[in-house]
């Protein structure tokens, strides 16, 4: 497991649903990986392969929406998506450096993430994305971000053409898929 203090939380996150070691290897080491695949059961062997590759590179690795498996496999942490509203897990079962991060789209979901004890809240979508016509825009993003004292990460629709607009939002960092898929961006 990578060691980092809460003050050294990652600022850049790449969501993956498949594993391409060559692609991940080309990313800057400061980019953390969130493995998110809701279509099939998680394959522990695959997750351990991703973990090993991330460890070799000094990269943080989070598993989406499976807290028990992330703890069992001694990962850096878990990502709780906005639809995960469970607050009945026992935080004392976590290792000292285990980090919970999660996403929200509204003030109500931000409050749930606060109750879950997340260290970072991913607010999304910042910009228009293919799967949804609703998006925050920088003004709405900043209004939502002001509703919490937890550090926020910008997520959704970030690409080369709107990347400079990230300067308009008050975020600790950003996360994405398409931005990191295009290797020319990094």
Annotated model-derived regions:
Residues 1-23:
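N-terminal amphipathic alpha-helix/helix-capping segment at the start of soluble metabolic enzymes
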Residues 3, 21, 27-93:
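N-terminal active-site wall of soluble small-molecule enzyme domains
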Residues 10-16, 31-35, 61-63, 78-80, ...:
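Hydrophobic faces of well-ordered beta-strands that scaffold small-molecule active sites
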Residues 14, 33, 70, 113, ...:
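Conserved, mostly hydrophobic/aromatic
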Residues 21-31, 110-123:
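Alpha/beta enzyme core
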Residues 27-30, 73, 116, 147, ...:
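Structural motif
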Residues 46-62, 85, 90-106, 134-157:
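Alpha-helix-loop-beta-strand connector modules within alpha/beta enzyme cores
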Residues 81-89, 120-135, 158-186:
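Glycine-rich phosphate-binding active-site loops on the catalytic face of alpha/beta enzymes
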């Amino acid at each position: 497991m990578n060691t980092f203090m809460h003050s050294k939380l990652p600022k850049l996150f790449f969501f993956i649903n498949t594993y391409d070691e060559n692609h991940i290897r080309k990313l800057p080491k400061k980019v953390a990986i969130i493995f998110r695949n809701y279509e099939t059961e998680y394959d522990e062997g695959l997750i351990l392969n991703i973990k090993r590759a991330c460890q070799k590179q000094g990269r943080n690795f989070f598993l989406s929406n499976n807290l028990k498996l992330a703890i069992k496999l001694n990962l850096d942490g878990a990502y709780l998506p906005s639809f995960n509203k469970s607050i009945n897990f026992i935080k004392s079962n976590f290792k000292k450096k285990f980090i919970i991060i999660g996403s929200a789209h509204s003030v109500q979901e931000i409050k749930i993430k606060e109750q879950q004890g997340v260290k970072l809240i991913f607010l999304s979508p910042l910009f228009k994305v293919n799967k949804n016509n609703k998006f925050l825009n920088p003004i709405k993003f900043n209004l939502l971000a002001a509703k919490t004292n937890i550090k926020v990460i910008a997520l959704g629709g970030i690409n080369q053409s709107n990347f400079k607009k990230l300067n308009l939002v008050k975020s600790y960092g950003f996360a994405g898929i398409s931005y990191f898929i295009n290797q020319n961006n990094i």
